[in-house]
Design a protein with these regions (language model features):
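Charge-dense, helix-prone N-terminal extensions
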Residues: 1-110
Length: 110
C-alpha cells in the first residue's frame, strides 16, 4: 500500500492538491495539510496522518485500534495515525472525507 492509493482517492475531493509536508507526500486543501505520510520517528512505517477533529479521532482509535492509533507526539494535534496496510478503500475514502469536512469547517470558523 502506497501513497498513490491515498492520492487517487484524495484528489477526487474538491480543492485537494498533491504536495509535500515536512518532505513527505501530502494532500493539501487551501494550503493546509489534509493527509501526509508520517515523518516522525514514533510513527510506524507506512502510516498516514489525517487531520480530523479530536472527538472523531478518539472514537476511531477506540473502535478500530488495529487501523487507527496515536503516539504521544501527535496527542495535541487534531489528527489520527492510520495503518495504510490495514485500511480498505471505503474506510480510507470516509476518513479523507472527514478530514476534508474538518478543514472546511475550520476555515469557515476563522
Amino acid at each position: 500500500v502506497t501513497f498513490d492509493r491515498v492520492q487517487k482517492l484524495g484528489v477526487k475531493l474538491a480543492g485537494v492538491v498533491v504536495d509535500k509536508y515536512f518532505g513527505m507526500p501530502a494532500l493539501k486543501l487551501d494550503g493546509q495539510m489534509l493527509a501526509c505520510m508520517a515523518s516522525h520517528k514514533s510513527a510506524e512505517p507506512n502510516t498516514l496522518v489525517v487531520r480530523i477533529d479530536f472527538l472523531e479521532r478518539d472514537l476511531r482509535v477506540m473502535n478500530e485500534p488495529d487501523i487507527y492509533y496515536l503516539k504521544p507526539h501527535y496527542l495535541n494535534y487534531a489528527c489520527v495515525l492510520t495503518r495504510l496496510s490495514l485500511i480498505d478503500d471505503a474506510a480510507l475514502r470516509d476518513l479523507l472525507e472527514s478530514g476534508w469536512r474538518f478543514l472546511k469547517k475550520k476555515k469557515r470558523s476563522i
